[in-house]
């Protein structure tokens, strides 16, 4: 038995010109129900399976309030097990090995890196842009690596805040400007992360780790993904 995607519609899988277009619906069987597995989808025509776990096989789209897989309409972050050593339920991933939670976060981190780069590219912070951008819309490798290395400080925001993705992007923009700008004026930009003590402390911990790595090159105190 199959069920339509989380958003109540079936989504088209992007393939080459003239190729078959997949429409994925949620797979519901006795086994998936018993093990509370709700992230396996199947094409109703060709029976291709898609495990919607936020991994590299998902097409993640930033919807403002979070990341959504374009293939299924499922919120990608709902499928990520933050801090867990393995999935809570036994899931069989066809055609490849079971990915770990760090792999699940790779796509999220890449989206943060991309959107931070896009924002800074269109901003007026010329001093910051010269230091952190390789070209229009692309961060320097060391800056992108610092986002990935420090991401463990903020990943739990996904479980505790609405619009978590936008908030995390805001935190990283705040940190980058504070580190690479010689000025303390942020213009008209208002950062949500400074309005809440909890999120402000997250921004401060990321900045502290960021500065420590820049100064010493030591990543021992910062969990690397």
Curated annotation (Swiss-Prot):
InterPro entries: Herpes_UL92. It comes from the Viruses. Belongs to the herpesviridae UL92 family. This is Gene 31 protein.
